[in-house]
């Protein structure tokens, strides 16, 4: 739907516009994954992304972003401070993802910021900050 129906409609109305994905949590992971799978996007805002997802590091290490992209990533500074063993990996995985993206030739700009708080603190503000950053 996104590539076959939605994007052609957007491009017909705004032919010169760049297309960025924006996501928080699992949608942040999806936004990043879409850059690895499709050439139709110019970047993504990925806030508090679910990069703890099993085998994500392996996937990201074996793939390249498909087209020149600007990427904004952020994470709350308390998100990795949890007793949940899976969720506690999110900080290391996010730092690792940033390193992978720095080495990707199609990543033209990469922003990575830490925000105060946990996963559920001010998601709208965090997303707005990311959008402002990549469009700024």
Task: Indicate residue ranges for each PLM-predicted region.
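Non-catalytic cap/lid and distal C-terminal segments of serine-dependent acyl enzymes
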Residues: 1-136
């Amino acid at each position: 739907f996104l590539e076959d129906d939605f994007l052609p409609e957007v491009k017909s109305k705004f032919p010169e516009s760049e297309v960025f994905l924006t996501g928080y949590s699992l949608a942040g992971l999806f936004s990043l994954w879409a850059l690895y799978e499709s050439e139709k996007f110019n970047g993504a805002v990925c806030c508090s992304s679910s990069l703890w997802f099993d085998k994500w590091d392996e996937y990201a290490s074996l793939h390249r972003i498909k087209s020149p992209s600007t990427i904004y990533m952020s994470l709350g500074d308390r998100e990795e401070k949890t007793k949940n063993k899976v969720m506690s990996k999110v900080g290391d995985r996010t730092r690792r993802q940033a390193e992978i993206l720095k080495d990707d030739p199609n990543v033209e700009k990469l922003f990575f910021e830490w925000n105060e708080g946990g996963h559920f603190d001010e998601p709208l503000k965090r997303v707005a900050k990311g959008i402002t950053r990549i469009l700024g």
